[in-house]
């Protein structure tokens, strides 16, 4: 078996970031492999989220906060100055892209092909060729052509997704995995420092998964046996990282 990593956000900002990261990974997977019409589901989910909420101001504030912190770290001894400089330059470039006036993904609303598909994709079984002949035609194109189309569509979200990837990398880097034990399947922790993300790495051979709850100063982890779908009463060894 292999180690599986589970993550639980402890605030709404990180919760939103993780959702967007999840969709971004699906977009990348669809760009590299021909998944036929399934490639549109994460694209339309991203369109929906970006229309409901303008993440730009929140992300820009987060970029500024991290640039300030990175600048302080840069003055310390025994730090990886190259890595810090990489994040400073990358975040500065991402900030410049995100400050452009147009909203991410807004131009896709003018695409008649995507608009027709999006109306149907929310309906069960409504992607048949008699419902969407234009989709049937597009799927018959060579993969290389469809790949170029898909790349052009998802590039509209790069100004948003690029800084979120960087910000989550920095968040995860604030803590290393340490050994921990859940006695009778339960573990509880607290922190004087405000936390934003709890990460649990556990061997799938244990046959269980964690359910994590909490807020920025306290969290609890319950392990559930998958086969029985009930709380485990065994001691579970796992790795824990609590990120600020």
UniProtKB/Swiss-Prot annotation:
Pfam name, any one: ZapD
Protein name: Cell division protein ZapD
Cysteine disulfide links: none
Role: Cell division factor that enhances FtsZ-ring assembly. Directly interacts with FtsZ and promotes bundling of FtsZ protofilaments, with a reduction in FtsZ GTPase activity.
Broad class of where this protein is predominantly found: cytoplasm
InterPro entries, A to Z: ZapD (IPR009777), ZapD_C (IPR027462), ZapD_sf (IPR036268)
Keywords: Cell cycle, Cell division, Cytoplasm, Septation
SUPFAM superfamilies named among the record's database cross-references: YacF-like
Subcellular location: Cytoplasm
GO cellular component: cell division site; cytoplasm
The keyword DNA repair is annotated on this UniProt entry: no
Any single biological process term in GO: FtsZ-dependent cytokinesis
UniProt similarity note: Belongs to the ZapD family.
Gene giving rise to this polypeptide: zapD
Subunit organization: Interacts with FtsZ.
